[in-house]
Design a protein with these regions (language model features):
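Walker B catalytic motif
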Residues: 178-179
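Conserved ABC ATPase signature
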Residues: 149-153
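The feature captures the beta-strand-to-loop junction immediately N-terminal to the Walker
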Residues: 50-52
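Helix-to-loop junction immediately C-terminal to a conserved catalytic motif
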Residues: 65
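Conserved ABC ATPase "signature" region
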Residues: 127-145, 196
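Conserved ABC transporter NBD signature motif
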Residues: 73-82, 92-93
Length: 258
């Protein structure tokens, strides 16, 4: 697997926009969740989202997938406005994959049968189905785990299974929600390597939201910090940790990437 530098400070130079939020706002009743936010996710980049609980990170993922609609503003995927597109259209047309923080697999099925079940939904050709499953088992080193029920896998193994399930549909965009949550250091390192390899080998554009600031910044090309429904800082990992507003609202004065 690829060796992860301590922090990925240089961003990808491809400037084609894959996801764009333009003046997007969202409210739940009288509570303003997102307040006129604007950002772009560039092709093949790993784009991180940081912020305290309730800042709007998961809401952004729900807006991208189409689970909810914005109150105002425009969301574009591959340059096309998608505000009124349902979930299945966005998933199929724009080849987006979503990995939730919890679940995302069939607990009582084996790892192999999880892959088989989802492949039968997203892959029509039976021979390609088998080939794809075998390739993913090899890629994720699942050979010794394939006959174990998903509920008996470790936290990191479950996370990797959910990513593998998302890859069955050959996504161009991958959304990872709290991918590093409640995992040990070695498992996080393995997931970081997996994510960077997907960028380098499969040219997948990846968005990650997480609370683990150092782990996320070690993986990302670009990241942004949300607070009270607004993007308060955006840039490379080194830019963010030196941003005064980001330190005040999120990192604190003692945070360092060294």
């Amino acid at each position: 697997m690829a060796i992860i530098k301590k922090f990925r400070i240089k961003s990808y130079k491809k400037l084609d926009t894959i996801i764009e939020f333009e003046n997007v706002s969202l409210s739940y009743g009288n509570r303003l969740i997102l307040d006129n936010i604007n950002f772009k996710v560039n092709k093949n980049s790993i784009h991180g989202m940081l912020g305290p609980n309730g800042a709007g990170k998961s809401t952004i993922f729900n807006l991208i997938t189409g689970l909810i609609k914005p109150k105002s503003g425009t969301i574009r995927i591959f340059g096309e406005e998608v505000n009124n597109y349902p979930v299945y259209t966005r998933t199929k047309k724009f080849k987006t994959g979503y990995c939730p923080q919890y679940g995302g697999f069939f607990s009582d099925l084996t790892l192999h049968d999880n892959l088989k079940a989802i492949s039968e939904i997203v892959i029509d050709n039976k021979n390609y189905r088998t080939e794809k499953i075998n390739n993913l088992i090899t890629k994720f080193e699942f050979e010794n785990l394939k006959d174990i029920k998903a509920k008996f896998l470790s936290g990191g193994q479950k996370k990797r299974l959910v990513i593998a399930l998302a890859l069955l549909s050959d996504p161009k965009v991958l959304l990872l929600d709290e991918v590093y949550a409640a995992l040990d250091v070695l498992t996080i390192k393995m997931l970081q390597e997996t994510i960077v390899n997907l960028q380098q080998e499969n040219q997948i554009t990846t968005c990650i939201c997480d609370h683990q600031a150092r782990d996320l910044l070690a993986t990302c090309d670009v990241a942004m910090i949300l607070n009270n429904g607004k993007i308060i800082a955006e840039g490379s990992p080194s830019d963010l940790v030196n941003n005064i507003e980001a330190k005040s609202a999120y990192f604190g004065d003692s945070f360092s990437i060294k």
